[in-house]
Amino acid sequence: MTDNCVSTVFGLLGVLAALTFPVTPGNAAEAQTVLGGKLVVCGVCHGVDGSPKLEGVPIIWGLQENYILKQLHEFQRGDRASDTMKKIAVNLTEDEVGPAAAYFATKQWPGPANASSSPPPTMAICEACHQPKLVGGVAAPRLAGQKYDYLVESMRRFAEGQRKNSPEMSGIMQAISASDREAMARYISGL
């Protein structure tokens, strides 16, 4: 995630959210019921329809609840680096983190992109944790259909030791070349 996504306008986040998040009876009621409107802030970067428009911002709709919960806690503790997400996550109470994770987990993953013709040879290792077709499971999140730019950046950060919240991923990504990681990201984003 780009750390300047919201931080330059953090004080005006409510205004941005109001302008960016279309208020309809359905989604306004859902957001109000779950977190008193705090979910509206998420839509500024992560997209109001589940498809982020900003570079480097991941799709979070439809991810596993336990994965979202883990990531929010890691942002709160500073175990996962992002100035923007830390500012947002620390403003969620423990009573709000669970409902936020549950809310996004119940949302429908955005429609698939165009799949590449064949997977790169390095893809086989991913299915061990991320499940066949990379739909995710208990131990690892869904990757299929995730944004290309987010995947490339996450893989790079794991490979360079900048993202430290999964030692397993760091080891795997360090063993894969940058060009192979890009090929993997291109394939995964098209699933």
Which residues does each predicted region cover?
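C-terminal capping alpha-helices of c-type cytochrome domains
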Residues: 90-112, 149, 174-191
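Inter-heme linker and motif-flanking segments adjacent to c-type heme-binding CXXCH motifs
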Residues: 51-52, 58, 81, 106-117, ...
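Bacterial N-terminal signal peptides
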Residues: 10-22
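The canonical Cys-X-X-Cys-His
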Residues: 42-49, 100, 123-133, 184
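Extracytoplasmic/secreted proteins, especially bacterial periplasmic and envelope-associated proteins
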Residues: 67, 84-87, 99, 121, ...
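Bacterial N-terminal signal peptides that target proteins for export
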Residues: 1-13
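Electrostatic cytochrome c docking/interface patches
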Residues: 22-39, 48-56, 96-123, 141
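Gly/Gly-Pro-rich "capping" loops immediately C-terminal to redox-active cysteine motifs
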Residues: 35, 50-79, 86-91, 127, ...
